[in-house]
Amino acid sequence: MNTHRLICATAIALALVGGGSSHAASQPSKYKGFTARVTNPWYPLKPGSVYVYRGVKDGQPSREVMTVTDRTRMIDGAPCVVVSDLLYLRGRLEERTTDYYTQDPRGRVWYFGEKTAELDRNGNIKNTSGSWLAGVRGAKPGIFMFTHPSPGQSARQEYYKGEAEDHFRVLRLDVPVKVPYGSFGHALMTKEWTPLEPGVIDHKFYVRGIGTVLERTAKGPLERNELVVPAGS
């Protein structure tokens, strides 16, 4: 995927969005008004912000460092903020990912792709599976966060057939959650799944003004990620 070049799309791909148990196509026909300045209170991406998470992945102690850069990139006609994500397992850098987010005029956060690379012990790229960019080879952007999430809302976060097909549904808005960074009484809880991993379900927890504070497996191999350093650090 690191050799992909952007192509111009003549029609904007549909993303499935809905409320209750149904999905509805609601992607705008154009990206007019989209901005790389992501200010959604449930997933703010202020340039310079750093989030550090610790947990368990693939049975190993993990550390993830997510940095919102001051860089932007046009993807399929939409201006996106560039976010760097580094995953360490047992202290060694295992995966390097660049994510692309944008916000529509209604305040919803959209996910427009990622460039991901698994690294070997020498730091060389051994796998780029899962990489995709909206508008390239049939890949479609998706909604990552609603402006005013409510239980039952659901969306497809990404679509690149066979590589990236994540979905999420809003479950609750009043969940108490405790992580190393602090305790919160009204977290947003979502359910995430993908048809590419049948039987695996994750729960994510978001706090207004911060973003993701906890991710854990609800069904499937144990994984957990907890916020230890807040945004702006």
PLM features per residue range, with description:
Residues 1-9:
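Bacterial N-terminal signal peptides that target proteins for export
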Residues 9-18:
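Bacterial N-terminal signal peptides
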Residues 20-24:
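Sec/Tat signal peptide C-region and signal peptidase I cleavage site
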Residues 25-233:
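Conserved functional acidic sites
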